[in-house]
């Protein structure tokens, strides 16, 4: 096995011995069978910007194969305000490369992000991912450059003021404990994100 893959915090990558982009349906089925996974979640963003979820209990091998192959029908008019009820049939199909073991589920659960397709089996042109793809292509056509981006997660932790080693406003950039608070919370979040397949450059305290 590639040692880089063996050391991956992504549990599926480490177990299957291949990068997530190479995951196949057979890989997903194998991981589910060999790791006692009891549920599968399909997750997909809607027009309100929130992530929606469909939960599947794994009844048998045939059922698992069916949902991984065909996805599931959803009501597009309840997900996007611009889709009318009369033409609202959409399908969500899992992207195997996004599979991750849900760290918060009490029942062993494998989750995957999904893509939208219309009733004729074509990708939904107005879906968030295809809107971004079209914007990237337009950017490339106009500038000749490739659009690349990284996300940055920032948050506040609201808690009573610490009496010992109080933090100083506008002086917390890259600060360490005990002056920076809740470092364990940040590192635990980073570990969960990495286990789910997120590629993290670094984490640090802010000002």
Predicted regions and their residues:
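ATP/Mg2+-dependent ligation/transfer catalytic cores
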Residues: 1-205
């Amino acid at each position: 096995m590639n040692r880089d893959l063996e050391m991956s915090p992504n549990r599926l990558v480490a177990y299957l011995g291949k990068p997530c982009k190479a995951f196949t349906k057979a890989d997903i089925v194998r991981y589910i069978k060999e790791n006692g996974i009891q549920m599968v979640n399909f997750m997909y963003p809607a027009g309100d910007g929130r992530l929606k979820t469909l939960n599947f209990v794994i009844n048998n091998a045939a059922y698992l194969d069916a949902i991984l192959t065909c996805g599931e029908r959803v009501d597009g008019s309840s997900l996007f305000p611009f889709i009318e009820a009369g033409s609202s049939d959409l399908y969500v199909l899992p992207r195997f490369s996004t599979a991750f073991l849900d760290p918060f589920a009490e029942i062993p659960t494998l989750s995957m992000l999904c893509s939208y397709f219309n009733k004729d089996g074509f990708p939904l042109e107005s879906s968030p991912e295809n809107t971004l793809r079209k914007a990237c292509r337009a950017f490339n056509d106009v500038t000749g450059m490739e659009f690349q981006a990284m996300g940055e997660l920032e948050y506040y932790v609201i808690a009573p003021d610490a009496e010992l080693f109080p933090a100083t406003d506008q002086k917390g950039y890259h600060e360490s404990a005990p002056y920076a608070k809740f470092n364990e919370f940040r590192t635990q979040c980073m570990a969960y994100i990495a286990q789910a397949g997120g590629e993290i450059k670094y984490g640090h305290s802010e000002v």
